[in-house]
């Protein structure tokens, strides 16, 4: 497996979106930055907040695009092109409707599952889907017509606690990924379910 050189947390910009479910990917990158002791700084060249971190002696770039969700690929493409980072070296963290709050899973490749952020990233990586994802469960409203309002809404306190617990476990698993490998990181994360 390629080493991960870029970790992206998907989000919508602006104070009104900070606590919305769609921003779960950004919560993960913010927590990673915090444990690495680095600050995410706005960089217009990469259309996002970026930082350079070191995890277990390995360099990694952190990125939260500040474009809207459906333009996330603009930021990912700009940073990946500049640093010559291949899709296989990218991990994209995003909210996942098809998993309950309290669960998170790593995955390599696959489609976008209707997620506009992933859709744009795939397009801007020349339709290469072969990047890693960290899927952070937010649950599903049960009706596809309610999805937009659901992802742009705030989770109730109990659900938010479960999502936060899964994000924390994902951060711990990311440390294992950098210290050991993806198989061990997956084994750890995929056995976790916050109650």
UniProtKB/Swiss-Prot annotation:
EC nos: 3.1.1.29
Site, as annotated: Stabilizes the basic form of H active site to accept a proton: 95
Matching PROSITE patterns: PEPT_TRNA_HYDROL_1, PEPT_TRNA_HYDROL_2
Keywords: Cytoplasm, Hydrolase, RNA-binding, tRNA-binding
Localization per record: Cytoplasm
Complex and partners: Monomer.
Keyword RNA-binding (UniProt): yes
Gene3D superfamilies for this protein: Peptidyl-tRNA hydrolase
Record: active site: 22
Positions that bind tRNA: 17, 68, 70, 116
Chemical reaction(s) catalysed: an N-acyl-L-alpha-aminoacyl-tRNA + H2O = an N-acyl-L-amino acid + a tRNA + H(+)
Top-rank EC class of the record's enzyme: hydrolase
Chain ranges passing through the membrane: none
Protein name: Peptidyl-tRNA hydrolase
Superkingdom classification of source: Bacteria
Protein family (similarity comment): Belongs to the PTH family.
Purpose: Hydrolyzes ribosome-free peptidyl-tRNAs (with 1 or more amino acids incorporated), which drop off the ribosome during protein synthesis, or as a result of ribosome stalling.
InterPro entries, alphabetized: Pept_tRNA_hydro, Pept_tRNA_hydro_CS, Pept_tRNA_hydro_sf
Record-level GO BP terms: protein quality control for misfolded or incompletely synthesized proteins; rescue of stalled ribosome
Main location group: cytoplasm
SUPFAM superfamilies linked to this entry: Peptidyl-tRNA hydrolase-like
Residues annotated as site: Discriminates between blocked and unblocked aminoacyl-tRNA: 12
GO cellular component: cytoplasm
One GO MF term attached to the UniProt entry: peptidyl-tRNA hydrolase activity
Pfam families: Pept_tRNA_hydro (PF01195)
